[in-house]
From Swiss-Prot:
Family named by the database record: Belongs to the GINS2/PSF2 family.
Name of protein: Probable DNA replication complex GINS protein PSF2
Location(s), subcellular: Nucleus
Keyword Ion transport: no
Alphabetical UniProt keywords: DNA replication, Nucleus
Biased composition (Low complexity): 181-216
Source lineage: Eukaryota, Amoebozoa, Evosea, Eumycetozoa, Dictyostelia
GO biological process terms, semicolon-separated: DNA replication; double-strand break repair via break-induced replication
Database matches in Gene3D superfamilies: 1.20.58.1020, 3.40.5.50
Subunit structure: Component of the GINS complex which is a heterotetramer of gins1, gins2, gins3 and gins4.
Gene: gins2
Length: 223
């Protein structure tokens, strides 16, 4: 099966178009890019710009970045508790949760309150979801009847990055399982064909023996 998914770096690149609030410490007219016009920039006045531009300005020490509302200790703790309560599904996370939080943790740690707690909570949330996914896959495979092929599974509230992380191993495992099932079916068909041939040979042998016995009886009767 051809792999048509995106690389993690490509998914992260797309997430960098998400708008985020920054507080500039410089004055400048609007910046014009192919993707749009951003500005003007006035010191101490918050402005929304793409994440990629915010990170670039942050690296130049031209602004502070305001993390999204959901990126606080209390809100992430609530998300983690909610994720644990749901056994058979997944909670809805903010769009590009993994990518945005990773980029902010790496590029503006001084702008994030309780950064160590947030980093741990983020990892706990994603690990819990990964564990639940693994359990769901095992449950699905165990529920299949003999000879039933594995095609697709539907997961709600799953991000592109999470799907990307499990896609390759999942598709590979499904292909291997289908090969095993097809091999078993071929073996069963071959066994059935062999049994059928053996039955035909036995029937032919019995018919020949019956004909021979009938001929002998006919000759004996004539004598």
């Amino acid at each position: 099966m051809e792999d048509i998914g995106l690389l993690p770096s490509q998914i992260e690149f797309l997430a960098e178009d998400t708008t985020i609030t920054v507080v500039p410490n410089f004055k400048m007219e609007s910046l014009i890019f192919l993707s749009g016009e951003y500005g003007p920039f006035v010191p101490s006045f918050p402005i929304e710009i793409p994440l990629w531009l915010a990170i670039s300005l942050k690296k130049k020490k031209k602004c502070t970045i305001t993390p999204p509302d959901w990126m606080t200790y209390n809100k992430l703790k609530a998300k983690f508790q909610e994720e644990n309560k749901i056994k058979d599904g997944f909670i809805e996370l903010p769009e590009n949760f993994d990518e945005i939080s990773s980029l902010l943790l790496a590029n503006c740690p001084d702008d994030i309150k309780d950064i160590n707690k947030i980093r741990i909570l983020k990892g706990d949330i994603l690990s819990r979801r990964e564990k639940k996914l693994e359990e769901s896959l095992k449950s699905h495979l165990n529920s299949l009847t003999d000879g039933e092929s594995v095609t697709t599974m539907e997961f709600k509230n799953f991000s592109m990055m999470e799907i990307n992380k499990i896609r390759a191993s999942y598709v590979s495992g499904i292909n291997d399982l289908n090969k095993i099932q097809n091999s078993d079916n071929d073996n069963n068909n071959n066994n059935n064909n062999n049994n059928s041939n053996n039955n035909n040979n036995n029937n032919n042998s019995q018919q020949s023996q019956s004909a021979s016995n009938a001929s002998s009886r006919s000759l004996f009767s004539k004598k």
